[in-house]
Swiss-Prot record:
GO biological process: maturation of SSU-rRNA from tricistronic rRNA transcript (SSU-rRNA, 5.8S rRNA, LSU-rRNA)
Region called Disordered, residue ranges: 521-555, 572-607, 616-635, 664-722
Keywords linked to the UniProt accession: Coiled coil, Nucleus, Repeat, WD repeat
UniProt signal peptide: none
Residue ranges the record marks as coiled coil: 423-476, 511-534, 620-681
Gene Ontology CC annotations of this record: nucleolus; small-subunit processome
PANTHER family recorded: NUCLEOLAR PROTEIN 10 (PTHR14927:SF0)
Record SMART domains: WD40
Taxonomic placement: Eukaryota, Metazoa, Chordata, Craniata, Vertebrata
Protein name from the UniProt record: Nucleolar protein 10
Length: 722
């Protein structure tokens, strides 16, 4: 038996353990059972609860006494009696079974749908009748009031076979190309069929007409689902009279209320595998949905996960035993799994001893230890020289390493390192000595990085003498021991630069907060020491003191800013002096090279101007080179001197930069030339105010522009004579 806990829900796998092969004789099986301890300790709840190769589907009779399973190879059906906990009978079939159903309360009436379109009926004694449907079938449902079997498959029709009359009835015509699953509501007998296009068609068996259609493919696409391709319906299950769960081929489950066309909840398995089975657990309001990889149990109202089961083999079918916490799975494996979940319900009455067994296991939990095997990684194998054994039966791959026999491991370890025991003994002695040293009185050692911060934290920790306050301020005391902040006192990259501008501007605020905290601690100690209450009006004094503290740290911030500006001026002055000295040196060097060249042969030298630059003179070359080589800080300082840049510091350490764009020399020259031109025109302009005539008053000879006084020959715009 294997015990696992998923989401704090205990799950017992009763089929876990070694199984004996079928080809062994009974005598050899008995011998193995006597010799092998693991086989003796295993729990075989139902004898021979397995198939030769694969189990495809599994069902429980209505009375709960019989468990029937269909599988291969060869195709067969097996019936197990729970009262006897053993196999009751086995019947071989002609072809593989797609699905089957139990029509009676016990095993006396069975219907099998085969992959070759045959429908086979079995009675209590065995095979009873066999017929064939027109198309390949995928699922069927039994309508008990009319004794009709509804078959769906690779066709747009729903075939009806009446078991009372023994003949086929008129089929139900649908718009779908193919249909995958079907189900009948146990309360009002509504028939529902899931189509290949992702639609669910609902029919009323009384009138044989479609009453509703649900588009599940479109509803399965939400923000929380991962849908790849067109979803088709792969599972259907009714719950009571109004509940319906639909499973899609892309791994989504849609929970519907039949009164609405929109799903109440959309749940995604996130595996992208078709949903194969759906079951409702009404006592806990759970839905059990299964694909080929996992069985998930979740709340039908909010989708919250209750637990999950992930068998080792792929799942073909799931059957929930009624009114209990037991379920069976048909797998791609000879063994059929039996799971018991006490949180879902009690054990069935035919195996009530499971409740006592699980209670004993919970009282005495045991950890799983592999005493006979040693887990080694690939690096360990290389150090032992056993890398060549990878892939051999001596190593069993598991996760990121391998399991090997513990005896082989000890032998190889002794051969590789014969002095391993001596080293182990020395390590143990060293550990004992270190433990004894830890009990001595130890001096506080400061870390290599941020010593002042560590010293400050230690001082604050020593000031907290009261135990209650020490609990409240436990963060400051344990900061040096906390692994999250351990790097801050070991890595030099985290060293606090106290000479930086940001630290000097923020330090007054931090020191003020620390001072306030220290004062508050002292006041609390005084309050606890005093027996009488303090007089009224203390709040105003605290406010006054806080205002004075605020004024104090504001003045300190201003003083720090003033000191920073003075230091900046001094640095800029020193840099200017250094640049002047460099300029003098470069001029002397250029003059020396000029004299050396004058004594030598005079040869012409050619210079190539770079593209995008304007050549003015050779004297600007050195200045340009200095400008290009200068750092960003030096360029900003030059701009600040020329009044085109202003740099201000705020109280919290940030900077404010304001700059103005200068006009180019060419633009200034053009503007100055225009101003000179206008001034010159103004100076040479002659006034014509002294030139006037008494005839007319206009611009011409008359009073206007012409000879008259108007614009022509008459009086016009000019002034008339008085």
């Amino acid at each position: 038996m294997q015990v696992s806990s998923v989401n704090n829900v205990k799950i017992y796998n009763l089929s876990h353990g070694k199984s004996l092969p079928e080809w062994l004789s009974d005598r050899k099986k008995r011998v193995l059972q006597k010799k092998d301890v693991d086989i003796q300790r295993r729990i075989e709840l139902i004898q021979d609860f397995e198939m030769p190769t694969v189990c495809t589907s599994i069902r429980v009779s209505r009375d709960g006494q019989y468990i029937l399973a269909a599988g291969t190879y060869k195709p067969r059906v097996r019936c197990y009696d729970t009262y006897q906990l053993s196999l009751k009978f086995e019947r071989c079939l002609d072809s593989d079974v797609v699905t089957f159903d139990i029509l009676s309360d016990d095993y006396s009436k069975l219907v099998f749908l085969h992959i070759d379109r045959y429908v086979e009926f079995h009675s209590q004694h065995g095979h009873y009748y066999k017929t064939r449907i027109p198309k390949f079938g995928r699922d069927f449902s039994y309508h008990s009031p009319s004794c009709d079997l509804y078959f769906v498959g690779a066709s747009s029709e729903v075939f009806r076979l009446n078991l009372e009359q023994g003949r086929f009835l008129n089929s139900l015509q649908t718009d779908a190309a193919e249909m995958n699953v079907c189900d009948i509501n146990p309360v009002h007998q509504l028939f529902a069929a899931g189509t290949l296009e992702g639609r669910v068609d609902c029919w009323d068996p009384r009138v044989r007409t479609r009453v509703a259609a649900l588009d599940c493919a479109l509803s399965s696409i939400t923000d929380n689902t991962e849908v790849e391709g067109l979803p088709s319906v792969s599972a259907l299950k009714f719950n009571d009279s109004l509940g319906l769960a639909v499973g899609t081929s892309t791994g989504q489950i849609l929970v519907y209320d039949l009164r609405s066309s929109r799903p109440l909840l959309v749940k995604d398995h996130y595996y992208g595998l078709p949903i194969k089975s759906l079951h409702f657990h009404n006592s806990l309001d759970l839905v059990l949905s299964a694909d080929s990889k996992i069985i998930k149990m979740w709340n039908k109202d909010n989708g919250k996960v209750f637990s999950s089961i992930e068998p080792q083999a792929n799942i073909n079918d799931v059957c929930l035993y009624p009114a209990s916490g037991m379920l069976f799975t048909a797998n791609e494996d000879p063994k059929m799994n039996t799971f018991y979940i006490p949180a879902l319900g009690p054990a069935p009455r035919w195996c009530s001893f499971l409740d006592n067994l699980t209670e004993e296991l919970e009282e005495n939990p045991e950890s799983t230890i592999y005493d006979d095997y040693k887990f080694v990684t690939r690096k360990d194998l290389e150090s032992l020289g056993l890398a060549h054994l990878i892939g051999s039966p001596l190593l069993r791959a598991y996760m990121h390493g391998f399991f090997m026999d513990i005896r082989l491991y000890h032998k190889v370890k002794t051969m590789v390192n014969p002095f391993a025991y001596e080293e182990y003994r020395k390590d143990k002695i060293r550990q004992k000595i270190e433990e004894s040293r830890a009990q001595r009185v130890q001096l506080k050692k400061l870390p290599k990085v941020n010593k002042e911060l560590a010293l400050k934290l230690m001082e604050e920790d020593t000031e907290l003498t009261n135990k209650k306050k020490k609990k409240k301020a436990n963060v400051a005391g344990n900061l040096l021991m906390d692994d999250r902040f351990k790097v801050m006192f070991e890595n030099p990259d985290y060293q606090v630069d106290e000479r930086s501008e940001e630290f000097r501007l923020l330090n007054p605020i931090i020191s003020n907060v620390a001072e306030r905290r220290r004062k508050s601690l002292l006041e609390e100690e005084q309050e606890q020491a005093e027996e009488e209450q303090e007089p009224e009006g203390r709040g105003s004094s605290e406010d006054d003191s806080s205002d004075e503290d605020d004024k104090g740290w504001v003045q300190e911030v201003r003083e720090q800013r003033r000191l920073l500006r003075m230091e900046e001026r001094e640095r800029s002055y020193i840099q200017r002096q250094e640049r002047r000295q460099q300029d003098r040196n470069t001029r002397l060097q250029s003059s020396d090279t000029h004299t050396q060249q004058s004594h030598g042969a005079q040869k012409p030298r050619f210079y190539q101007i770079k593209s995008g630059e304007e050549f003015r003179s050779f004297s600007d070359v050195s200045r340009k080179q200095k400008t290009h080589k200068a750092s960003l800080e030096e360029r900003l300082q030059r701009l600040e001197k020329s009044d085109t840049l202003s740099l201000n510091d705020t109280a919290v350490g940030s900077k404010q930069l304001t700059f103005t764009l200068k006009k180019t020399e060419k633009q200034r020259f053009q503007q100055q030339a225009e101003r000179d031109h206008h001034e010159e025109r103004r100076r040479i302009r002659r006034s014509a105010g002294h030139l006037h005539s008494n005839r007319g008053g206009g611009r011409g000879r008359g009073g206007g522009r012409g000879r008259g006084g108007g614009r022509g020959r008459g009086g016009g715009r000019g002034r008339r004579p008085f």
